[in-house]
Every structure is written in structure tokens, then in C-alpha cells.
Amino acid sequence: MVPYLTMEKYGRIDSVLIHVGGPPKGDLLDIPEEDWDKANDMVLKPVIRMAKLVTPIMEKQGGGSIVNITTFSAFEPSLTFPTSSVYRVGVSSFTKLYSDRYGPANIRMNCLLPGFTDSLDLPQKFADMSSLKRLARAEEQAKVAAFLLSDDSSYMTGQSLRVDGGVTRHM
């Protein structure tokens, strides 16, 4: 496991970034139950599993920061991505619960909700959804993640920060 290898090599874990792949898609009621289970296994369970692994370590060392990368549409579900919409809002809920429970141990957990990013091969219509009329650059998202993981955000926890170029400005 990565946490154990990290502890062996560095002796501590100060921050963890959790980013999972895209779960199965389909028409809302046509998605097989197995795909709903797969989506849960891909999106929500890795966050819970990693938290279980690193929390005791972070408690012993006096704190840490965990960032979950989800999606800008976590709170505005999309019929295009139904399983993602359902389970990523679950990640945000888990993040809030975790923050309440482990904040006193100086362990922070936040979510980064990125918009459409240039690392994906997307048509212009997705860029046009942004107030800025462009896709986010991957390094822009990375800088926000680095901020959330750093001590510069030491008073932020339980938050879901949208970095979507204004796509959700009306929601």
C-alpha cells in the first residue's frame, strides 16, 4: 500500500490527493445495478479507504490535509454523468463529516471541483460553457490543489471549492 511505502521512505504523510477515474455512464434507469456498484467502488469507496489508512498516521503526527478531486457538477447533477453525479456528491458529504470528526486532530479534508480541463480532448462547446470561454489549464487546477494541501489553507476544511471558470455561476 502506498501509505506504508511512503511512511517507510519519508517517515510521515502530510498531505494526500485523491483523484479517481470516471465511472460508467448511461441513461439513468438503464444503468445496470452492477455499474452503480462499480461507480461506488470507483468514486466513493477509495476516499473512505484512503482516509482509513492515513488518518491514524496523521493523528499521530499532529495533523495533515486530504484533498478529494471530484467535479464541478457534484452539486448540480448531470444526466450525461448520472453515476458520477450521485457518488461525487457523496464524496462531498463524506468530506464534511470527516472534517467535523477529525478537525479537532488538525486533519483537514476538502474537495476540489474542477471544470472542464484542457487535458481532456473536448469539443469547443465545453469551453463555451465557461464565462472565460476556454477550458481550464491542468496547471491551474494543480495550483488550487497545492493550495488546499498546503498550510496556506490551514483554516479551510469541509469545503468543496469550484474551479470551473464560471460554468456553475448560475446554479
Region locations from a protein language model:
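Substrate-binding pocket helix/loop in short-chain dehydrogenase/reductase
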Residues: D27-L28, D35-N40, F126
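Alpha-helical segment proximal to the catalytic Tyr-Lys
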Residues: P56, D100-P104, S154
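Short C-terminal tail/terminal secondary-structure segment
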Residues: E76, A146, T157-M171
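Active-site loop of short-chain dehydrogenase/reductase
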Residues: R12-D14, M58-T70, P104-I107, Q159
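Catalytic loop of short-chain dehydrogenase/reductase
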Residues: V67-G90, T95-P104, F116
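A short, exposed helix-loop element centered on a Lys and neighboring polar residues
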Residues: A51-K52, K96
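A conserved structural motif in NAD(P)-dependent oxidoreductases
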Residues: S130-Q141, D152
